[in-house]
Structure formats: C-alpha cells, structure tokens
Amino acid sequence: MSADQRVLVVGAGGLSSPVVRLLAERDIAQLTIVDDDVVDESNLHRQTLYTDADVGYSKIERAKIAVEAIRRGISVRTVEGRFLPETAMSLLRGHTMVIEGADNLATKFLVADAAHIAGVPAVQAGAVRWAGWAFCALPGSACLRCLFEDIPADRIETCAEAGVVGPVVGVLGALQAAIAFRLLEGERPRGELWHYDGLRGALRRTLVRRRGDCPLCNGEIQDLRVERYTAPCAA
C-alpha cells in the first residue's frame, strides 16, 4: 500500500467512529474529517470514538485527539462544517477516496454525486434500528443513484429519530473500513452492496449493476445544484 494515500471522512459520528479508529492505524499520508456537531452524551452508545470527557466538545476536535493518540505523527486535517454543494468539490480534491457516515440522505446523495463527478471512490453506509447497508461505488461502476434513485419526496426517519442499535452501527462502520482497506491495497470492489440484519446476525453481499436510466451514470447530473439536496431531512 502506498503511504501517499489521503482519505476524506464525511461525518464523525457512529458510522465513522470505527472507520477513523482503524484508519488511524494505517500508513496513510493524511486523514481529513468533516463535521459540524458536538459530542452528545445520548449518542455515546454508538459514537465509540468518544468518552464522557468529550461531551459538549467539537467532534472533529476530539476525533483528532483520538487519532493522534492511536498513531503519533499522522497528519489529521479537520474541517468544522458540513459537506455542502458549494464546498464538496474542493474538499474532495487531492483525496484518494471519500468515506461517508452522515445521518441524512441529502448528504449521502451529495457525497455520491460529487465523488462520481470527481472520479473518486466512495464508501457509504446507513443504519436504522437493527439493520443497515454499506456500499462501494467506483468510477465506472454502479453509483448510489443506481441503488436508491433519489432523495424521497416524503420525509423519512433518521437513525437519531427511529433509533439504532449501537453494535449495528459498529458493524456497518467496520465494513466501511474493511472496504476502504481493500481500496488502499489496490482492490476494486465495484458496486459491492452489503446488507446487515442485526436481529438475525446475517450479512449478505450483492453486486449492484448500473441502471441505464441513472441520471448520474448517464451524465445528466454534471453539477451540484443546491435544490437537488434540499429534501426534508435531519442534520
């Protein structure tokens, strides 16, 4: 694995907690973490990167401290703010891949679109209650829109509202890290979709094919218009 790899992590919550911990142990050139939230006591059961002592502090500030405690000398860049249409392309620039762990569909689709346009691999995931998914999109392979098409017109519950079992988030975050490691090692897991059912303890892999009518894959989406990502959603 080349030591000049640079990884962008969008979100520093439950999904990203195992991702950040595991990436901190790898020989990468830089880890960039983007988030605009503070550590909340009610989320500690799934945001395992933090402890009681971190409550009330900026997530990216405490995430950087945690990473540097795991591996001294690692370059950690923190960006306090959201991954937005007007900043997405500049944040992606120079990175080997993006790993997304946000808690809203608008950000998930924005990351997918921006990564596709920039030609950057994207590793994404989501979890609600006892189940979740992890997905890997590479340039030329199926994208998130091939899988979910678009942000639903009707508001849907996020994990913060519907609830999520902490270990389920941990499993999905670890899956993201595993996919990222494979990418860093030179593998190309095109269109891999992993489903995890925590109630049954079942993990299943399927391969997603590109849809002929996918607006992102067929080039209809070539920019990041704000109105594309303004469906009702929680932060």
Locations of regions flagged by a protein language model:
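Adenine nucleotide-associated cytosolic modules
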Residues: 1-235
